[in-house]
Amino acid sequence: MDAAIVSQLSGPPALVRDAADLRPAGRGGYLLPRGYLSTRGSQIVDDRGRPVRIASIGWNGTDGPPGAAPSGIWTVSYKTVLDSIVDAGFNTVRIPWIDLGLDTPLHGYSDRLGWINTTLNPELLASDTPRTDGRYRYVTTLTAFRRIVDYAGEIGLKVIFDHHTNQGTAGQQRNGLWFDLGPGTDNTDGIAPGRFSAEMVKENWLRIAKTFAGNPTVIGYDLHNEPNGDRGHITWGGGGPTDIKAMCEDYGSAIQDVEPGVLIICEGPETYKPPPQSSGMDPTLAAPAGNLTAAGANPVRLKIANKLVYSIHEYPEEIADTKRWGIPETGKGFVDRMNATWGYLVRDNIAPVWIGEMGASLRTPETREWARNLLDYMNGKYGAEGGPTFSGDQQPISGSWWLIGPSNDPPYGLQTQWGVGHFRPDQIAVTDQMLFRPQK
């Protein structure tokens, strides 16, 4: 690495940590300090300027259709799910939301929307009295989020909220965008008739920001999950309705007016084929994990500096379907692709990148090699190949494993059953490598 870059990355002298700030999680990981976070160069830092690592895991369920419950609470309490996250060594949970679901009561009685064990989750009841059919009424999704954040704060776990889709379609939004109504769309979400304009999505973000304003348990807002540049004709700059850089600046700065403490997390649009020249992104590079090729020269600019974190999602072939596009998932080609499409931001001390989703079944040699390559890259072991490196009190790249609990589909989840413990040995061995271990 160039000596000037090493000098830039070394930053100020290491700051001595107060032992009271070092609150252990499980498996040798540590919780984050109690306050908000900021950025310095490509490091995420606490409110005293000390580097930290966001070691997070996703908790699904509320990315489903309106009324869908957080996963697992048919078997255990939501508090037990949060306890299990800390027990696994993580310090943050990433929770999805959809526009159509914020004000919808949790259903609680559906295989599709999730069941709720009322005995174990009494805080989620809207009324202690059942309806005439014997079923209980539950709180809205937004109220459930309040309960979750309250308990997360009690145990020292941080929360990042993620705008997943407008209406709760499975996976990423099918039109590739963060809105499904108005200019830039065909007035559908790719499946159903559109219901949410870009301005309406912004207003929902502001509702969430107002709900948790002043509460440093909530440390970040992931503005939109997996924007797809191929489907959505997304640009980086240019000012049109599908300009994702403009959206991040507009939404992010508006959120900062309400809640100046949080990190604003901006995902690069997925481009499985090189985007057109007019996109503002590098027209020679495919970026299935998220295209941040333009972020270095044309960065997102917020009202409050040092609060911007970029994000991408890294998955192997079994999930990301990269082979048919000729995109390598391991080896030199994998490292070169990460360097060019997002890793340079960290290597050159431009901005932090948080891998907002990552995961694999680890049941095949290919997925195990993918995990080894990715974790080695995150931990600075590919410096000779042009990847980021870390020294002194710097922390490696932050990430979020997908997902807590068991699942029937790849990547199958970190656990074999709900509750504290029950970890899959192959997955927990990988996630142990992404935990926060501060310099003492």
Language model features: what each stretch is:
Residues 102-105, 168-171, 230-233, 274-275, ...:
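Extracytoplasmic/secreted cell-surface and envelope-processing proteins
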Residues 371-440:
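Extended, alpha-helix-rich binding/interface surfaces that flank or overlap catalytic cores
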